[in-house]
Amino acid sequence: MAVFTQITTEQLTDWLTPLNLGRLVEFKGIASGIENSNFFVTLDRDGQRTDYVLTIFEVLTAQQLPFYLELMQHLASKDLPVPRPFASTDGALFRPLAGKPAALVSKLAGADTTTPTPTHCASVGRVLAQMHLAGRDFKSAQPNLRGLDWCLMMESQVAAFLPDHIADLLRDELMVQQDFAQTEIYHALPRGAGPCDF
């Protein structure tokens, strides 16, 4: 389950107050995910209920978060289907909750799937292309925290969940990527923000 940090109703109610989005109706942990604690949150504002997603960041630091949250804000402002972070009354996109940085974002329609179809893949490809185009004028930058070094570090953890023949394919591909990362072509590739953990 992807709830590593537990929170109380009282903690969340206090944390939500500076966002001025309404009264807490309910919240529940989200079972999927591998890195952060995530919760569905329902708020009521003048009789109108709205669903959100709360993320408590377990790994990313307060210094790393602005890049990601500002990128999400940038892409959402261009009408891409990405979660939109909500700022508190002082403009902060994240604040501490249970001793860790946390952010509230819009809840997107849809659900995850463990059996993607070619249609799903085509939809993802379209949105990724739109994201890359929309991100060209995003000015912030930061090192790729989900680049090749991270992939190499995660390989053994991921391989533990894979059949042997698939784990072998993963290892082989990472070797190809390591070799490619040493080439002039790789170093000449354009740089920009992207969903590198995808």
Q: Model-derived features: where do they sit?
A:
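Short N-terminal amphipathic alpha-helix/helix-capping patch enriched in small hydrophobics
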Residues: 8, 12, 34-37, 68
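An alpha-helical support segment within catalytic cores of ATP-dependent transferases
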Residues: 8-18, 139-141, 152-197
